[in-house]
Amino acid sequence: MALQQIVEQTVTGLGYDLVEIERSAGGLLRVTIDLPWQPPVEGGPVVPEQFVTVEDCEKITRQLQFALEVDGADYTRLEVSSPGIDRPLRHEQDFTRFVGEVIDLTLKEPIGAAAEGQVSANRKKFRGTLERAEDGGWQIVWSDEPPVKPGQKVSKKRVPAPLQALGFTLEELREARLAPIVDFKGRSAKPV
């Protein structure tokens, strides 16, 4: 059985989602897991988001060590972890889950003539808010205005930069990740 299948069956069999498998030099096998996501129910109670714990990683590690040994998989070290604050977005469900979040997006090809002179035609990387597009696809909305630094005074006369939007499909993406924005005030429940 292929390594991908063994890992996927083991992780999903224990009730987790497989986010990513990575093989590195030196025999490192890195497995990234997450808890399954359930869309919020309209009018239902706001359920705080669950996060992967060390105990979850430990449970997966033990089971994977056994499964990989039985199959004779070649690896030196096994590392199981959560996706972290810069979680990769790969599947439609990931994008649905993180609508309204700030993401970093890299396209396979530059946007070219579609830029219509508003941004560089060679641009491939964007950071903005993920939104559902009207046609059922996805879009990222951003402003090229520099962020206001803490303590910086902003002129009342300053005109804010206009918001820009870029529609995209999953096939056009090289990579999409949650933007690593750190808030030291603690986690708060997302409004539904």
Curated annotation (Swiss-Prot):
KW Phosphoprotein (keyword) present: no
GO cellular component terms, A-Z: cytosol
Protein name: Ribosome maturation factor RimP
Entries under HAMAP family matching the protein: RimP
NCBIfam families according to UniProt: PRK00092.2-1 (NF000929), PRK14642.1 (NF011235)
Localization of this protein: Cytoplasm
Gene3D superfamilies registered for this protein in UniProt: RimP-like superfamily, N-terminal
Family per record: Belongs to the RimP family.
GO-annotated biological processes: ribosomal small subunit assembly; translation
Its job: Required for maturation of 30S ribosomal subunits.
